[in-house]
Every structure is written in C-alpha cells, then in structure tokens.
Amino acid sequence: ESFYGGCVREQRDLYVYKDYPYAQVADSVRVDISHKWAFDIYARRLKLADTFKAGHYVLEKGMSVIDVVRMLKLGLQTPVKVTMNNVKTPAQLAGKLSRQIEADSASLASAFMDGATAERLGFSSPLTMFSIFLPNTYEFYWTVTPEDFIDRMYKEYKKFWTGERDEKRKRSGLNRVEVSTLASIVYEETRKTDEMPRIAGVYMNRLRKGIPLQADPTIKYAMQDFGLRRILYRHLKYESPYNTYLHRGLPPSPICMPSIAAIDAVLDYEQNDYIYFCARPTFDGYHNFARTLAEHNAN
C-alpha cells in the first residue's frame, strides 16, 4: 500500500540539475511526501542514485512512490514554457533564457555567438543569425542544450517564412536578414502597430533614394548604451557600422528582436512619399510625417 498509494500531498515542481548529487535529489523529493521510507527502499531497488535524470518534473498530487521513482529514473519531464521578447542583443537573450531553462547565460551566449553554428545555418555572422529568434512563447524541455535550442528556433524561423511572406519580401528587394534588420529599427521607433507600415515606408524611401536612414535607435545600439535618453550631436559622430547617420543603407544586423507585427509591417510597408518623421508634440507615441525638410522643420 505504501508503494502504490498516494504519497505526494500537493502538486509541485521539482527541478533536478545535472550536477546535483543524489542526496540532494532525494531530499528535494522527501520534503513533501508521506511514506518517505517506502521511497528510499524503492529508489534503492531501482538504483535511482546511479540512474536519475536531470529535468523539470511535476509531482502530481496523489502520485505513488513507484510513480515518482520511475519518473526520475526514466526522465519523464514536463516541458516548460519559454517566453522570448523585448531583447536587444544575444547576451540579453541569453540572460532572459537562463532564468527559464537549465542552461546558464554564459553557455547560451557563447552558443549564440558561435561562428560555426551561424555558418552551418547559412548566416554570415552570429549577429545576423540573431534574426532566427522570433518573439513568442514556446515549449521546451528545461534541460534543452543551447545547441538544440538554436536548432529548434531555426525550425520555427523556417516555418515563419511562409511562401506568402517570402513573396512580399522579394517585392521589397530585401533579403530575410534585411527585413528583420529594418523591422528592428521600426520596432524601436514605434510600439504603435498601426503606425509601423508607415514608418517602414519612410525607411524604404530612404533606402531607395540612397539617403542615410538617420535612425536614432541605431546610435544607442552602436554605443551599446540602451538607457541613452537624448541623442546629442556628438553621439551622431560615433564611429560604428551601426551608425546610420554616418553610413548609408541598413546596419549589418538587427538592433533588437523585433515584434512579428514589425516584421509584417516591413513586408506590407506603406507606399508613401514621406522622407521624415518626428514624435508628435503631444507625445502620445505617434509621429508627424513630412515629404520635405521644410515640412519636417514645421512639424
């Protein structure tokens, strides 16, 4: 009865790290179960000390000692939900993920910055590979390795680029990384989804006319100073391939993880003849747009 009856009193999560000694695993299980002695006997019989698997487990209310020992021996993990959004660099993404899966931020960051991985997936650099990470909530096993994490995200990226999206992309004349890069600038310029296609249209006009994009968020990224409140004249002189005041065209890679809405706004950019925009004086998050410098200065 003690082996088959319910021993788990309340549902709870159990995280077993790869480097945990067995005593620590056993203690974490024993904390909240009845029939502790039955757990010890059955665990010994199944040699759990030598065979337990790392993972995220859910101890369900009413589980028996046999259920719990088998779960740990066979590694019957429950996936965790992993949310990715609002990050600007691979290092920031690594930090955010390390709070949601077992891998630490250092091993994640080094995988994200691995040149061989980028090359294998067909990217020119780890910073352009950053465009495979699309904001969403995904299910992963908590023990997923950084390498398997990247491979899974690459699959999601390939699914995202449907035939329809690729057709629109071809019409824009941009490649996928360039779409993500422009979307990252649009996303940093506005969080207003309904305004994104118009801002994307302004930048498309500038790209086509060979006018520097002059996008302030690229300065913050170039300086890696994301708290910068005001962009001053001296900041515009900061030498970096990401400085779109000094260099024409798009920066070398995305300056953040853009929202899906921002990517779609670039693919469905508004056909307009605006060249300038600035924040509205009401500071409601929207912008005034202008065709000429005179109009722009009047805004």
Feature locations, PLM:
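Signal peptide-directed extracytoplasmic domains
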Residues: 2-161
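Bacterial extracytoplasmic/cell-wall-associated proteins, especially those involved in peptidoglycan
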Residues: 95, 101-103, 117-299
